[in-house]
Amino acid sequence: MTPPAEQGAGPARVPLRERENTTLELTATGLAALAFVVVAAVALPVFRLEAAPISGPGSVGQYAAVAAAVAAALAFAAGRYALHTRSRPRMGGVLDVVDVAALALAHGIIALLGWTLAAAIMAEAFIGATVFALPVLAVSGAAAAVSAYIAFLSAVNMGPQLLAVVLATFLVGGVLASALTASDPEWWMQNLSTLGISDDLSARAFNITLVIAGFLVTVLARVATRELPTATAGGQRRVLGALVLVGVFLGCVGIFNVDTRFWIHTAVASGMVVAFGVLTIRLRAWVPGISRAFLPVGWAFLAIIVVLAAFFAAGYYSLTAVELVAGVLVFTWIILFQRNVGALDADTARGGAA
């Protein structure tokens, strides 16, 4: 029988340095291991090998959430730098650096909110329980490791569609956390912006969430329209402008509080809806290649927002309900828009290659 080596050359082994995906996966695993070791080591002097509560001040949940946030932010920055060294894509200006910083912060906050919520749920499941010394080290290290791993892979695979998901996750998590920790339990009887009018940590978190989310929308707009296929002359610029306006107005909602700058706050909130409406109505003219089946989705969302606003004016619905539904519809549309643009881009590239 002929030895396997003599039957054919077989597939050539690719050197590790040329296996980019494998290298990135190994790097993510290495960063996760590093985060585990560092966070577990820091937990030694923090908890002094003593038991700790699951959630609340001085708890393993609080420590793990903060450590995971730092690990996620640093890992995301490391992932973008890894792509930068491979010129895929290369950061070429201040805006690119600011984009990376904002996205790293968003990943850190998502990790912070996620682990805080997980700890709160576990505390409700195990009422009165404490975590022993060694599990404290293991749990906190594991939380940081998982967060670093996910954030690094998110950074190296970041695209318009994933960025839209990150934006939605960040915005929903921030608003939900503010609502759960609001000093006024009846805030919803007034409007959503009431979450940002007090001086407590919950209000600051709400306003910061809106500002960062607004900036992320502008980042998303730049990324999504950079190579928008089949856009007419000037269409790409107009789509970019409309999305940027949505982001800027969203950030301004967090900057100008409803209790101190009512008219400015109302103007920018209304402007966000107007910009969204213009974009959905004019999208077909600006991007002729966009799916015809997608266009009625935007029109329907806009019609629902207008009807809800009319119901609020007539006294049937509260402003909170209108704001929540409008926010969900706008950002759902943005996510769907990114997916349709991605599909259009792929089809255009396939058609050009054929």
Show the residue positions of the predicted features.
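Short aromatic-rich membrane-water interface segments that cap or initiate transmembrane helices
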Residues: 60-64, 194-208, 335
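Terminal transmembrane helical module of multi-pass membrane proteins
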Residues: 4, 291-354
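A loop-to-helix transmembrane entry motif
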Residues: 203-210, 260-274
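Membrane-helix boundary elements
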Residues: 58-60, 224-229, 238-265
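Membrane-interface helix-loop-helix junctions at boundaries between adjacent transmembrane segments
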Residues: 90-182, 187-201
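N-terminal signal-anchor module of multipass membrane proteins
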Residues: 1-75
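Alpha-helical transmembrane segments in multipass membrane proteins, preferentially the mid-helix core
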Residues: 143-154, 219-222, 274-290, 336-341
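Alpha-helical transmembrane segments of multi-pass integral membrane proteins
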Residues: 31-37, 103-115, 164-186, 205-219, ...
